[in-house]
Design a protein with these regions (language model features):
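Feature marks short, highly hydrophobic, charge-poor N-terminal signal-anchor/signal peptide-like helices
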Residues: 1-9
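Acidic/His- and Gly-rich active-site-bordering loop/insert found
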Residues: 8-141, 162-167
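An extended, acidic, His-containing surface patch that forms the Zn2+-binding/catalytic region
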Residues: 89, 99, 211-212, 271-337, ...
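A common structural junction motif
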Residues: 115-116, 265-270, 368-376
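Acidic/histidine-rich catalytic neighborhood of metal-dependent amide-processing enzymes
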Residues: 138, 144-224
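A short core secondary-structure module
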Residues: 187-192, 247-270
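Short, solvent-exposed beta-strand/turn "edge" segments of beta-rich domains on protein surfaces
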Residues: 228, 249-251, 321, 338-343
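Short amphipathic alpha-helices in soluble, non-transmembrane regions
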Residues: 252, 363-371
Length: 477
């Protein structure tokens, strides 16, 4: 009984300690902005990106149209002649690989981003393949996803080659033409590197970026560096019955069972929430920049508030909540073709994203058990597990964040969990440090434009992107 009386006092003391720690910790502001002195250079780079956007490189699942990508390669060769004439070039079915021999064969690095883009549908304010330069932005499909990165690392190499520079280690450039549908482009390039016996020290792909307000209540620009990808699966659930006329429905029809299943999953998620080390490091990094004292208190004292954070975070931010557990989103459905017919079979499609503490096998088993409870069968159409996390205390990540600091003074860098998928996943067999980061600024407008209408990138951030890749190449490994 005595211990029960002591417990509230201990709790109050712990909260008081957390409050004092927050009060004495200085609040920081992230006010990094690209230098205005780069306007002329920014416009020159914008012109190169514009020409790249003007070549339509739309790709489709199962599509095979190397001609359009060879037209894009011709444009690249015109824009970056030294890269194409001085580096060793390999093309495999439209996928590009360049090799730049360094002073040492130890710790080679690979810079990559994809050439292909998603279809551009709907009414755009600037034609999707115009490459218009207006209002401080370059407009068009692929501007941010991800021809800006391709332009930047090609330009970085082009300038260094013009200086007669030799990098300290071998450098590879890679660009697939099948990323948007998780095709076999990147695996073909990886197979070629494996044939050569290449083991990479570091891979830099798209994924993270310089993000404006990465979490609500944390204003400013932050370098969010992707350190692993969640796994994913497409799953079909099927309910069957004898069917019948809608005028005399029985209980537990196929659609009713599917609805009950969805309701249970949505109301009581079967997946565990856990604060992974990479996510905890992200919150600790961002905590001093929070605009409110309460958020600084919560994020800056995970030793005390981690259970509370796991409880409230999914309600505050769906993106941040997805970093805590496996997610499932119901996306497609089918049933009867007539309103007055109970279907003999109804189906429901879902997309799942697996977290490391409940990977592919466990998450699928959990959802299958729940589906069976409602009389549903489960079919996994496609699945792959999460990628191994980058060691955020390791040599490669430390070097990477140091280069960010050197290139973008005053910009805070934080580890970040990728809830989407990139080509970097295919490089895991030959690299333990596949880092996802595009050195450009993605504000709310750029985030909306990716795979949507009016995709664009602010051209003032392009010189910084080129400098970042140059600094990464120059860095002693």
């Amino acid at each position: 009984m005595k211990y029960l009386l002591i417990l509230p006092g201990v709790l109050v003391l712990l909260v008081l300690i957390a409050v004092v720690r927050t009060l004495v910790s200085p609040r920081k502001t992230s006010d990094y902005q690209p230098p205005q002195t780069d306007e002329a250079e920014a416009l020159r780079l914008a012109g190169k990106l514009s020409k790249m956007i003007q070549v339509d490189t739309t790709s489709h699942a199962g599509g095979d149209d190397p001609a359009r990508f060879r037209a894009f390669h011709k444009t690249l060769a015109e824009l970056f002649p030294r890269v194409f004439s001085q580096l060793e070039k390999t093309e495999i079915d439209g996928n590009l690989l360049f090799y730049w021999k360094g002073r040492s064969r130890e710790k080679p690095i690979l810079l990559m981003s994809h050439q292909d883009v998603v279809p551009a549908e709907g009414a755009w304010s600037h034609a999707p393949f115009s490459g218009d330069i207006a209002d401080g932005k370059v407009w068009g499909r692929g501007a941010s996803d991800t021809k800006c990165s391709v332009m930047a690392f090609f330009e970085a190499d082009e300038q260094l080659l013009a200086e007669g520079y030799t990098p300290p280690t071998d450098v590879y450039l890679a660009s697939s033409c099948t990323e948007e549908w998780a095709g076999d482009g990147a695996p073909k390039l990886v197979a070629e590197l494996q044939r050569r016996g290449v083991e990479l020290f570091l891979v830099c792909d798209e994924g993270g970026a310089i993000i404006s307000e990465p979490i609500g209540g944390i204003p400013g620009n932050f370098a969010m560096v992707g350190v692993f990808e969640k796994g994913k699966a497409d799953v079909k659930f099927t309910a069957k019955s004898t069917g019948g006329h809608a005028s005399a429905p029985g209980k537990h029809t196929p659609i009713a069972r599917l609805a009950a299943f969805v309701t249970e999953v949505e109301t009581h998620s079967p997946f565990k929430k856990k604060l992974l080390p990479e996510v905890a490091a992200m919150f600790r990094t961002l905590a001093p920049y929070a605009s409110s004292f309460g958020l600084r208190l919560l994020l800056g004292n995970l030793w005390l508030f981690a259970p509370l954070l796991k409880l409230v975070l999914p309600a505050v931010s769906a993106q941040a909540g997805a970093m805590l557990r496996t997610t499932i989103a119901f996306t497609t459905q089918s049933g009867s073709d007539a309103y007055n017919v109970i279907p003999q079979e109804a189906t429901l499609g879902a997309n799942m994203r697996f977290i490391p503490h409940q990977g592919e096998q466990e998450s699928l088993a959990i959802i299958q058990t729940l589906a069976e409870k409602h009389g549903l069968s489960t079919e996994v159409l496609h699945a792959n597990d999460f990628t191994p996390p980058v060691d955020i205390h390791g040599e490669a990540f430390t070097l990477f964040t140091r280069v960010i600091g050197e290139t973008f003074p005053g910009l805070a860098a934080s580890p970040y969990v990728m809830t989407g998928a990139t080509d970097a996943q295919f490089y895991q067999p030959i690299c333990k440090s596949c880092i996802r980061f595009a050195p450009v600024i993605y504000g709310p407008e750029q985030m909306r434009g990716m795979h949507g209408l009016n995709e664009n990138i602010e051209y003032r951030c392009l010189p910084g992107a080129v400098r970042f890749y140059q600094n990464l190449i120059r860095a002693e490994k």
